[in-house]
Amino acid sequence: MNDWMKNIPSDYLVSEINLPGTHDSCAQYIRFSHISRCQRNSMTEQLNMGIRLLDIRVKFDGEKLKICHSLLNCKKDKRKKEDLLFDDVLKSCKDFLMQNPTETILIIFKREAGKNEEATYDYFYNTFVKNSEFFYTRNKVPSLASVRGKIVLLNRCGANVENAEYSDENSGINLSGWPYQNSRKDALLQKVAIPERSKKSEQFFYLQDFFNLNPKKKWELAVLPTIQNSPQDKAMLFNFFSGSNFFSSPKRYKRIIFKRFFGYELMPMKKYGWFVLDFPNKKIIKKIILTNY
């Protein structure tokens, strides 16, 4: 599954492709793993399995951009001594794309802790993005043709609006309006505006990210209705399977929701959007990918 996108027509927008993704993609080696671990596979393993959407949470300490899950730092290996850095994530992505130039990787970039969003994005942009040939940074959903071999930046961080250096050309797809959905009384798919600097925006994306419903309710009220009623337009659609609360760990959510998902028949060539998963296996990734053909 390392090069499955080679068979997708190049004129498709990436939002028209059903993508398997991971939630808190780097939370493999982490303390308090019962409640905080979300992945069993490394970044490279995920990409080779077919994952194309990565959820990267960061903490800038003034010197380094560390990968974290909430306040906990993600670690490089099972010894849990050395912090995982964005440098490591980027190297894994670059190495994969150089070996598989037909593919694209979408990164949701979010400041989770540490310095404020302005300082975090300034460091991220100037250190990793500026003058890089690997990043697609326009505030517009691209065609697959324009981003094969590249990383599409989905920016939840919110670049400093006072900094004239930033524009709709170099700050990524603007997801800074991403709402906290658990404050809502319903679990219905939400339509969220994508702000633009240069003009009044008509862009939007769809979001289902209710993470503190119990697993059965999460499937019944959030995940399944999003699958059944997925809008067939060209907007991005995020459908999070992940969840965690006092009574249920990420692994329990995965076990209950995956079992129901495997029992639900998906239709080929229907748009379902982007599935954001904890602990995905090859079987569920293949099920998602095959809907594109």
Language model features: what each stretch is:
Residues 117-125:
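Distinct, well-ordered alpha-helical segments
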Residues 1-53, 60-99, 104, 145, ...:
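Long, acidic (Asp/Glu-rich), low-complexity accessory segments flanking structured domains
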Residues 142-146, 230:
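Short, conserved, surface-exposed binding loops centered on an aromatic residue
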Residues 169-240, 244-245:
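Acidic, glycine-rich loop-and-strand cores that form catalytic or ligand-binding grooves
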Residues 104-111:
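Acidic beta-strand-to-loop metal/phosphate-binding motif
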Residues 55, 182, 189, 195, ...:
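Intrinsically disordered, low-complexity sequence elements enriched in Ser/Thr/Gly/Pro
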Residues 113-115:
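Serine-dependent carboxylesterase/thioesterase catalytic core
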Residues 126-143:
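Acidic, His- and aromatic-enriched active-site or binding-groove loops in soluble protein domains
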